[in-house]
């Protein structure tokens, strides 16, 4: 829970990474208690094939609530979202969930880029620019979340 409070966006990405790890290597669930507990939750929530833990969904909901508050309160934040929206809309249209929120799309973008880098696949300069924007938005949200 310390990671969640310190950087909620990293917390969500960390949970997604663990979910994928446990799907790929279920036998590793016994490596430590945290993995064992998360594996049990994944089985209980019936997401061993796909989907996200309720822990991750709840954290994303918290981030979404903060995002919506900031959209109403901060013109600079609203401007950053407007600027990245066209790129996020393209990303959303290429997923199986085109109605996902902008914040979830930012997280998906960063997660997909991480996977591409692990595979040593090239990242276009346009994608790197959008990554930079998404990172700044998520950093700001995480910082604001931590200060609450």
What are these regions (language model features)?
Residues 68-101, 109:
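Charged linear interaction tracts used for macromolecular binding and regulation
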Residues 1-51:
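N-terminal interaction modules that seed assembly of large macromolecular complexes
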Residues 17, 37, 41, 55-62, ...:
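Charged, amphipathic alpha-helical oligomerization/scaffolding segments
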Residues 5-8, 15, 53-56, 74-81, ...:
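Amphipathic, non-membrane alpha-helical segments in soluble helical-bundle scaffolds
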Residues 24-28, 44-48, 69-72, 93-97, ...:
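Intrinsically disordered or highly flexible coil/loop and linker segments, enriched in small
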Residues 21, 41, 66, 87, ...:
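Residues that form generic nucleotide/phosphate-binding pockets
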Residues 34-74:
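Heme-based O2/NO sensor domains and their adjacent alpha-helical segments
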Residues 90-148:
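Glycine-rich, aromatic-bearing surface loops/beta-hairpins
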């Amino acid at each position: 829970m310390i990671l969640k409070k310190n950087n909620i966006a990293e917390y969500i990405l960390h949970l997604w990474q663990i979910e994928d790890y446990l799907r790929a290597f279920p036998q590793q669930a016994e490596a430590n208690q945290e993995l064992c507990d998360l594996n049990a939750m994944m089985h209980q929530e019936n997401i061993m094939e796909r989907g996200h833990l309720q822990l991750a969904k709840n954290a994303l909901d918290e981030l979404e609530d903060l995002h919506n508050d900031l959209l109403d309160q901060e013109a600079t934040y609203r401007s950053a979202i407007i600027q990245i929206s066209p790129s996020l809309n393209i990303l959303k249209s290429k997923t199986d969930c085109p109605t996902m929120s902008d914040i979830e799309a930012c997280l998906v973008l960063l997660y997909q880029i991480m996977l591409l880098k692990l595979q040593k696949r090239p990242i276009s300069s346009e994608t790197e620019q959008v990554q930079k924007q998404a990172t700044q938005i998520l950093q700001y949200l995480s910082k604001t979340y931590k200060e609450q």
